[in-house]
């Protein structure tokens, strides 16, 4: 989606059954119990469209974090909600559409910490983090949609129940999992993760990165934990 393109505005969001959701089939059992909330959210997004406010990311991208197999998730990174700038958000937390410039400042700080932590040169041409997702890193926002230009605007509309179901299910599996929780809002879900090892620090936003995010070494720490759990480390390079 070009940076200057406006958010899509479909007439209606049609999420009647679990089969209507663009998710990997392995997630259906996890999200089926919250299908009522998802239907209500579809009606809410339809109303937002009809009122002229719209939403981000575009409907096909809302559930992108769930398009990878449930059983293959080995790292969970939790964000707040999508980037509110049209053309930026694409359904994965902290990730941007290919070609977005300048990069969001939180993502710039993530790349800075990754370079320091791993001792590598980061030459990412954009902020597309799908290479991480393909290795089993779930980039999940706590709230999956946002009103364009209005950060945190869909908080409390029902997405929290949906993502809580996903986080809880991940924590209950008998498979390796490491959670990276940046900032207080992300750390509030730790109670849903059971005995999952969690890496916590300040958020990478410019307001808080210098208060404990820089120097926290989350990427190398995650790989050490994965190795201890018998899982393949992540190649964080993009």
Curated annotation (Swiss-Prot):
GO terms for cellular component: cytoplasm. PANTHER family: URACIL-DNA GLYCOSYLASE. The keyword Cell division does not apply. The active site is at 81 (proton acceptor). It holds the Pfam family UDG. The keyword DNA damage applies. It comes from Corynebacterium efficiens (strain DSM 44549 / YS-314 / AJ 12310 / JCM 11189 / NBRC 100395). It is an enzyme of class 3 (hydrolase). One of its GO terms (biological process) is base-excision repair, AP site formation via deaminated base removal. Keywords: Cytoplasm, DNA damage, DNA repair, Hydrolase. It is found in: Cytoplasm. Belongs to the uracil-DNA glycosylase (UDG) superfamily. UNG family. Its EC number is 3.2.2.27. Excises uracil residues from the DNA which can arise as a result of misincorporation of dUMP residues by DNA polymerase or due to deamination of cytosine. This is Uracil-DNA glycosylase. It comes from the Bacteria. SUPFAM superfamilies: Uracil-DNA glycosylase-like. One of its GO terms (molecular function) is uracil DNA N-glycosylase activity. It catalyses: Hydrolyzes single-stranded DNA or mismatched double-stranded DNA and polynucleotides, releasing free uracil. InterPro entries: UDG_fam1, Ura-DNA_Glyclase_AS, Uracil-DNA_glycosylase-like, Uracil-DNA_glycosylase-like_sf.
């Amino acid at each position: 989606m070009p940076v200057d393109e406006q958010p899509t505005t479909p007439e209606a969001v049609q999420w009647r059954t679990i089969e209507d959701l663009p998710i990997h089939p392995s997630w259906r059992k996890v999200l089926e119990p919250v299908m009522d909330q998802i239907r209500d959210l579809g009606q809410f997004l339809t109303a937002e469209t009809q009122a002229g406010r719209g939403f981000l990311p575009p409907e096909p991208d809302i559930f992108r974090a769930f398009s990878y197999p449930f059983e293959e998730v080995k790292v969970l990174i939790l964000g707040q909600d999508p980037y509110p700038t049209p053309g930026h958000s694409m359904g994965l937390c902290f990730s941007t559409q290919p070609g977005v410039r300048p990069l969001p400042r939180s993502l710039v700080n993530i790349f800075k910490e990754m370079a320091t932590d791993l001792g590598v040169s980061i030459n990412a041409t954009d902020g597309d983090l799908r290479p991480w997702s393909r290795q089993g890193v779930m980039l999940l926002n706590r709230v999956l949609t946002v009103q364009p230009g209005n950060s945190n605007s869909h908080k409390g509309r029902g997405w929290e129940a949906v993502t809580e179901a996903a986080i809880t299910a991940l924590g209950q599996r008998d498979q390796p999992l490491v959670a990276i929780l940046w900032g207080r809002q992300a750390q509030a879900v730790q109670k849903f993760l059971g005995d999952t090892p969690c890496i916590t620090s300040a958020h990478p936003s410019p307001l808080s990165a210098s208060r404990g995010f820089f120097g926290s070494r989350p990427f190398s720490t995650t790989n050490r934990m994965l190795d201890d759990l018998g899982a393949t480390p992540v190649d964080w390079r993009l």
